[in-house]
């Protein structure tokens, strides 16, 4: 597991700026592998906002590496895993590189 402080905060804009190749996919939640060892706590209002975005399908896609290791979006993933009824697909941006390579790119 990787510490939250070692994982960069990513979105499509950052990926484009860093010229990191990615593609938009819909995948099953079970195909995603979380790699972050710790989470920042968040209050009920923050949880409700994220939950609402997930239910309305307006959430930012989760960011996964080439092997579906979750790089960004662990709180959203935690909420998605607790949904009842379960979600059958999740929006992701899949990178064409590994999470180790991503970490190295952002250390520079």
PLM feature spans:
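Compositionally biased, intrinsically disordered low-complexity regions
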Residues: 13-14, 33, 98
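Short alpha-helix boundary/capping and kink motifs at helix termini
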Residues: 17-71, 75-81, 88
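Amphipathic, charge-rich alpha-helical segments that serve as recognition/docking helices
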Residues: 36-42, 85, 89-108
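Polar/charged alpha-helical tracts
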Residues: 5, 23, 67, 100-107
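N-terminal leader/domain-start detector
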Residues: 1-23
């Amino acid at each position: 597991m990787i510490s939250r402080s070692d994982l960069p905060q990513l979105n499509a804009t950052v990926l484009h700026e860093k010229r990191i190749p990615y593609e938009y996919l819909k995948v099953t939640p079970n195909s995603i592998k979380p790699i972050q060892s710790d989470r920042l706590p968040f209050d009920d209002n923050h949880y409700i906002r994220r939950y609402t975005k997930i239910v309305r399908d307006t959430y930012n896609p989760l960011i996964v590496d080439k092997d579906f290791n979750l790089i960004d979006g662990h709180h959203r993933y935690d909420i998605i895993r607790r949904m009842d009824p379960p979600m059958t697909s999740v929006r992701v941006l899949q990178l064409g590189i590994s999470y180790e390579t991503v970490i190295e790119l952002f250390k520079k």
